[in-house]
Amino acid sequence: MNNTTVTEDLLRTASRFWLMKSEPGECSIDDALAAPGRRVSWFGIRNYQARNFMRDDMTIGDAVLFYHSSCAKPGIAGIARSASDVYPDELQFDPESEYYDPKSTKENPRWLTLDVEALFKCPVVEIGRLREEPELAGMRVLQKGNRLSITPVEKEEFAFIVRNLL
């Protein structure tokens, strides 16, 4: 399947659309594409609003703009889809992990993750390029002060990006 077919299929079938940020040093689009089944766990979410988006709103098959953040060229680096229901992020229980949470228990985990399946890589659409498009002015990633690692994207915004910028 070519990239256009993949994105048009997502536009037809996805219930919701998301932008998910990952630091390339932690997990890049290349890492995700090289993973078994092109699936990676979206670990390390430690913001309640982002966690709640995953827990309450994301479903298997939702479309994802895979966004590289905290790097030289932040921007959309690929397209993915959510590939599992949420489950406890095991790193919250590991005292050696930077994601350890001493208040979290196996019986009552605070932090969740889900699997994301990478579909394809694209030339990075940098944040400055996104800002140039009036059709994208409402995207949360473009709002001043937004630091959430997972944000909803309107279907029309997703469609504009995949049809005009990728």
PLM features: what roles do these ranges have?
Residues 1-60, 157-158, 165-166:
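Compositionally biased, charged N-terminal/linker segments
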Residues 8-12, 56-58, 72, 105-108, ...:
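A general structural signal for short secondary-structure junctions and capping/turn motifs
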Residues 14-17, 60-63, 77, 111, ...:
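Short, surface-exposed beta-edge/turn micro-motifs
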Residues 21, 117, 151:
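Residues in well-ordered beta-strands of folded domains
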Residues 65-66, 81:
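Hydrophobic beta-strand signal
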Residues 67-74:
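Short, charged beta-turn/beta-strand-edge "cap" motif at the junction between a beta-strand
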Residues 78-148:
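Aromatic- and Lys/Arg-enriched surface recognition patch
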